[in-house]
């Protein structure tokens, strides 16, 4: 889609020069950091030694997933050095990102904004089951919309929309 928007100079939506910021997880983190939104610490997977050095900083478990893409496909939780060595012994031929594992509940912030990036509608969803568990364990996905958006989530969500500089 971005290529078509670029080729035909369509200014709604992202063109090629900005698509990497939402296509690659490692690049997304730069946008979050720009406006002070916290993310899990990460390391682009290179070799076993550097992976173990990163794990020495953040501890076990860690999560590894393709840097490019969405969802939880080909995502793994590595719980110990044996898991890490097995992963590195058979790394798929794509760039992976390794992140510290953060235990918690997934809540989303979704906002629709106008051409000035002012929010015109916002909502939040609560996901009782971790998405990685839903995919890896083939669980049913379910979530519900929250009546109220917590102030800290609303603030982080609004800052994120401004940071990503999306087009209407």
Stretches with model-predicted labels:
Residues 78-168:
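Internal nucleotide-binding/catalytic subdomain
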């Amino acid at each position: 889609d971005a290529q078509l928007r670029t080729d035909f100079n369509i200014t709604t939506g992202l063109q090629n020069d900005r698509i990497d910021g939402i296509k690659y997880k490692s690049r997304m983190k730069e946008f979050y950091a720009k406006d002070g939104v916290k993310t899990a610490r990460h390391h682009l997977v290179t070799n076993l030694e550097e992976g173990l050095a990163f794990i020495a900083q953040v501890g076990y478990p860690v999560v590894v997933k393709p840097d490019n893409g969405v969802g939880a496909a080909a995502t793994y939780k590595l719980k110990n050095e044996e898991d890490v060595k097995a992963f590195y012994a058979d790394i798929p031929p794509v760039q992976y990102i390794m992140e510290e594992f953060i235990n918690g509940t997934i809540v989303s912030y979704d906002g629709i904004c106008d051409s000035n990036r002012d929010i015109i509608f916002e909502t939040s969803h609560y996901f009782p089951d971790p998405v990685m568990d839903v995919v890896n364990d083939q669980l049913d996905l379910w979530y519900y919309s929250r009546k109220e958006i917590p102030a800290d989530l609303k603030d982080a969500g609004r800052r994120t929309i401004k940071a990503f500089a999306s087009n209407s």
